[in-house]
Design a protein with these regions (language model features):
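RecA-like P-loop NTPase motor core of helicase/translocase proteins
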Residues: 1-322
Length: 322
């Protein structure tokens, strides 16, 4: 059974929010560079059948040529069209210092994964950017994202005349990185945060010089592509250690997609729970609160000042005994 996907305007609006931020950026179908060949072992005797020589030609994302002032002007235009507060400046972060850090807020169940896949295709169509990394907080989400790429491939082929090639990063299948670097098409690497911020030997291979990778470090091959990094559910990846690890990717820009951003950056789109309900995108929303009965002005009260969202949520209160 084939799934049929319908273009939804509210999803297109979320795509356009990111794409229009870079209005004026010229289209460039990748910048050629030489992939680090690593250390090649000398051949002591000619083989009967020579293997095909590996190409060292790579294609990386072109740099953003817009100035900070131009980007901020574009951001303001996007924010005005969506009734969002205007950003005083472009936000930076430890995960992508000096690069655009954009937040897209979308309520759960409104097709967030579809939106960022379509954003990838639209950024490639308009500006030529073709190298992407999607960072997810768990293996389960990683597998779900890969499945989304697989089931939408034909849909995007029909829309754009091409489809993204996606793969899950695996430190034992590093030939995928060679193809990621050299292929001219849309390349998407999906990686869970544990693959590069954990301390185990297998997880740390991304930072090691590997004999089976011509004594190169996988992270160096990745960062040479100047990838666009997309974080799915960033509030689950917010530890300082993880943010510093993300900086190793040398991101051209960082796009965050979530219904509940814990830290705000440059917000370019918002589809919150109430918006989703009003547009009939979700069936219902629930609001949890306190009900107070029989409270007179002369009686004591308890005032809830704030709620801290952490692993164990807690509230800050104020008691007045009058």
């Amino acid at each position: 059974m084939k799934l049929q996907f319908k273009v939804q305007q509210y999803q297109t609006d979320a795509v356009d929010a990111v794409v229009e931020t870079f209005a004026g950026q010229p289209k460039h179908d990748g910048i050629s560079y030489r992939i680090d060949p690593g250390k090649v072992r000398p051949v002591t005797a000619p083989a009967l059948f020579e293997a095909e020589e590996r190409s060292d030609a790579g294609l990386r994302n072109a740099e953003i040529v817009l100035s900070g002032a131009q980007l901020l002007e574009n951001v303001h235009a996007v924010q005005r069209s969506r009734n969002l507060p205007l950003s005083a400046k472009l936000a930076s972060s430890a995960a992508a210092p000096g690069a655009p850090n954009l937040d897209v807020e979308m309520e759960t169940g409104t097709g967030k994964t579809y939106v960022y896949i379509k954003t990838i295709m639209e950024l490639h169509k308009r500006y030529g950017w073709s190298k992407y990394i999607i960072v997810v907080p768990s293996v389960a989400i990683r597998e779900g994202v890969k499945k989304s790429f697989d089931v939408t491939a034909e849909h995007f082929q029909q829309l754009y005349g091409t489809k993204p090639r996606s793969f899950i990063y695996n430190s034992s299948q590093l030939h995928e990185l060679e193809r990621f670097s050299s292929d001219a098409g849309v390349q998407v690497m999906i990686i869970n945060i544990q693959a590069f911020n954990a301390t185990g030997k297998d997880q740390r291979r991304i930072y090691d010089e590997l004999d089976d990778f011509q004594s190169r470090r996988p992270i160096d091959v990745i960062k040479a592509n100047r990838p666009i990094v997309i974080i799915d559910e960033p509030q689950k990846i917010g530890a300082d250690k993880s943010l510093k690890a993300l900086a190793e990717f040398n991101a051209l820009m960082l796009l965050r997609y979530s219904a509940t951003h814990k830290v705000d950056h440059t917000k370019v789109h918002r589809l919150d729970a109430l918006d989703a309900y009003n547009q009939k995108l979700v069936k219902k929303i629930a609001v949890r609160g306190l009900t107070v009965k029989g409270l007179a002005g002369s009686t004591a009260y308890l005032y809830l000042d704030a709620i801290e969202i952490a692993k164990t949520p807690f509230g800050k209160g104020e008691q007045n005994n009058m």
